[in-house]
């Protein structure tokens, strides 16, 4: 059995021996993306599992060990991990936990310390916690993020973004209910099989997969009747995690809406952009600057490959590239606003409005200052740019009830339906007017 080793400041390390013996548990956020990430790490030699437990026990365990005024995502992530350790499914003497650390000023950078504190209180002080980060915040002898691993993660991000995007655009209109979701599951299985054989992550294989995904989704029979189109933005965990947002996408689908959720690639490029800015402004190694620049260029090329595949299909709404999002906030919010989701959150709302998704749910953990500034705080400015924007901020925390959240969203949808009906009526009137003008011209031509 692996020996427990600690750093000078008392942090329990994840050692090379543990890599051979331990199972690593990871909290879930994006179901499709994380299945692909799971395979990437398993292929790299880690016995890793993405958690799927989502009962109310997760919240209860979180409340036991995390103060209820702490960031709601922290409470859920920690609750999910402790609930898993309590389940009896895992040998807790051979289990490690993994959590991401962005290294920014958001409270998310402190989740790892809150998790260690909670583990000690719950009697799991001997469970090591691995920080997944590119900032050099914490290192472990038994875990390393290699350039090859990063590139494979990027491929997973692009595939996940594309499947999420196309599923949302097709399932709202599909004639055979469930066909779009079945295609997502089919592609996840195909990609997992390719990943296990080191295929589909780069080059021609990657581009061919993107083309095939777009082709197959476009082949699903649909009836494109006018529907309310709703964008979902917000704090990254609450925006994406069905556990955190009370299955928001499912609720919007039940209200007969088409949903658009901006992908993870935008956030990835946003973080790289910030790192480059910080090195220029505050100093840093030239090697790190070159590596981040290379990585950003690589991500941009992968993003472009996805957008190119989508542009071949006029039936799909193609999201804007990150470079365009960056230009949208000029005169609205400064680039120095980069805590949490920062100016990207504002940019995503502007881009959604520009793309025809003027009805927006802004998901925010209660008390999340960056989210309130860049999300709720920007609604007024966004309305000046897009007067028809219909944005509702929704707070999520342990005491917020699903009924209240859904009632607020229903009020927003009521306004959205009124706007849609007015638009349809105006289009019909314009069409009738044109037809009338054509009819009047016919006798004149005949003479």
Please name every model-derived segment.
Residues 1-447:
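An N-terminal assembly and electron-transfer interface module characteristic of large anaerobic redox
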């Amino acid at each position: 059995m692996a020996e427990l080793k600690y750093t000078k400041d008392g942090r329990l390390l994840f050692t090379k021996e543990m890599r051979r013996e331990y199972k690593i548990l990871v909290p879930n956020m994006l179901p499709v993306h994380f299945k692909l990430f799971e395979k990437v790490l398993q292929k790299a030699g880690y016995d890793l599992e993405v958690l799927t437990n989502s009962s109310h026990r997760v919240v209860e365990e979180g409340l036991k060990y995390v103060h209820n005024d702490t960031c709601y995502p922290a409470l859920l992530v920690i609750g999910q991990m402790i609930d898993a350790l309590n389940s009896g499914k895992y040998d807790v003497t051979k289990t490690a936990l993994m959590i991401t650390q962005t290294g920014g000023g958001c409270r998310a950078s402190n989740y790892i310390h809150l998790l260690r504190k909670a583990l000690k209180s719950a009697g799991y002080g001997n469970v090591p916690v691995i920080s997944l980060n590119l900032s050099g915040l914490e290192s472990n002898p038994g875990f390393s993020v290699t350039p090859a691993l990063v590139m494979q993660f990027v491929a997973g991000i692009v595939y996940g973004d594309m499947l999420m995007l196309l599923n949302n655009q097709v399932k709202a209109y599909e004639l055979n209910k469930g066909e779009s979701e079945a295609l997502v599951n089919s592609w996840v299985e195909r990609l997992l099989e390719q990943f296990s054989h080191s295929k589909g992550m780069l080059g021609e294989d990657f581009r061919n997969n993107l083309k095939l995904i777009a082709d197959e989704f476009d082949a699903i029979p649909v009836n494109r009747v006018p529907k309310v189109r709703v964008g979902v933005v917000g704090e990254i965990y609450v925006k994406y995690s069905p556990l955190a947002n009370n299955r928001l996408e499912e609720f919007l689908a039940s209200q007969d809406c088409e949903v658009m959720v901006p992908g993870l690639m935008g956030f990835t490029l946003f973080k790289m952009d910030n790192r480059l800015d910080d090195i220029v402004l505050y100093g840093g190694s030239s090697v790190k600057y070159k590596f981040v620049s290379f990585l950003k260029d690589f991500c941009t090329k992968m993003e472009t490959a996805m957008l190119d595949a989508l542009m071949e299909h006029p039936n799909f709404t193609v999201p804007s590239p990150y470079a365009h999002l960056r230009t949208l906030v000029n005169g609205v919010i400064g680039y120095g606003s980069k805590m949490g989701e920062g100016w990207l959150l504002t940019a995503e709302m502007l881009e959604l409005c520009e793309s025809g998704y003027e009805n927006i749910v802004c998901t925010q953990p209660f008390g999340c200052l960056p989210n309130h500034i860049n999300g709720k705080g920007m609604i007024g400015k966004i309305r000046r740019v897009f007067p028809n924007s219909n944005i509702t901020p929704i707070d999520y925390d342990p005491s917020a009830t699903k009924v209240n959240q859904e009632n607020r969203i229903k009020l927003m949808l009521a306004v959205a339906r009124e706007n849609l009906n007015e638009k349809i009526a105006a289009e019909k009137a314009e069409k009738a007017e044109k037809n009338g003008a054509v009819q009047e011209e016919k006798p004149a031509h005949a003479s």
